From Swiss-Prot:
Residues 2-198 form the ABC transporter domain. This is Uncharacterized ABC transporter ATP-binding protein BpOF4_11395. Coiled coil: none annotated. It comes from the Bacteria.
Length: 267
């Protein structure tokens, strides 16, 4: 789920958790209305950290696991498996406030999955993580997905969304402006993008009909054009000038689609 700040992502998540009632309609999971009594099947990683800073990691995870209906004897092995996976076994007896922001985020993620939820909601899960730890978390999300967990998450990292998601919803002021399978959304996006690289100047191309954007880049240009017919015209024009190192028609990136549908002010 994507959207600018204030678009309604967190509000939607709170409705999915049964914390807020929709103004109209209802939230359902597997055909049944979601209310507070069904939240044991849901895991939630909030954008704002909600851990108790004075509690030790072990006590924190046992407490939250018990709230989800688990027995302590089941929590301990699950907790230690995740601590080992995230390379934080040494922190089991440390207080939350003694951990770095990145390691706090790992513990909060463990808290959201320790009860093996059917539905996992992740609100900006990669916040505060360096590239190495972001990769660890991403691999964990992929593994959970393979095991059958349904995952809904929001992120401002378009590369993570493209890599992890099958379906996409872009919100604007609480209303979906794009929704569907990510592959189909990209395929149906009318605008095309052309990357041209070479030693010559390509300034004259920006005046051709159908060219919507002209962007200088290292060693060449990137153009946004109305459709493939315009791309053919540009190819013919470029071919007249002789050698071109690269001419490629690209699929729109998620960043391109987001800017088109939500606006440059929010990108």
């Amino acid at each position: 789920m994507l959207g600018a700040n204030g678009a309604g992502k967190t509000t939607t998540f709170r409705m999915m958790l049964g914390l807020l009632e929709p103004t109209e309609g209802e939230m359902t999971w597997k055909g049944e209305k979601i209310d507070y009594s069904r939240t044991n099947v849901i895991g939630y990683l909030p954008e704002e950290r909600g851990l108790y800073p004075k509690l030790k990691v072990r006590d924190q995870l046992i407490y939250l696991g018990r709230l989800k209906g688990m027995h302590k004897k089941d929590i301990i092995p699950e907790m230690r498996m995740w601590l080992e996976r995230f390379k934080v076994t040494d922190y089991e007896t440390k207080r939350i406030e003694e951990l770095s922001k990145g390691n706090q985020q790992k513990i909060q993620f463990i808290a959201s999955v320790i009860h093996r939820p059917e539905l996992l909601i992740l609100d900006e899960p990669f916040s505060g993580l360096d590239p190495v730890n972001a990769e660890l978390l991403k691999e964990a999300v992929i593994d959970l997905k393979k095991k059958g967990t349904t995952i809904v998450f929001s992120s401002h990292r378009m590369d993570h969304v493209e890599e992890l998601c099958q379906h996409l919803c872009i919100l604007r002021h609480g209303t979906p402006v794009v929704k569907g399978e990510l592959r189909e959304i990209k395929r149906s996006f009318r605008n095309k993008f052309i990357v041209i690289e070479g030693e010559r100047s390509f300034e004259t191309l920006k005046n051709l009909p159908g060219v919507k954007k002209f962007q200088q880049k290292q060693g060449g240009v990137r153009l946004q054009v109305e459709d493939e017919e315009v791309a053919k015209v540009i190819f013919a024009e470029v071919a007249k000038s002789g050698y071109v190192r690269r001419f490629e028609v690209e699929e729109p990136s998620l960043q391109d689609i987001f800017i088109e549908k939500v606006g440059t002010a929010y990108a």
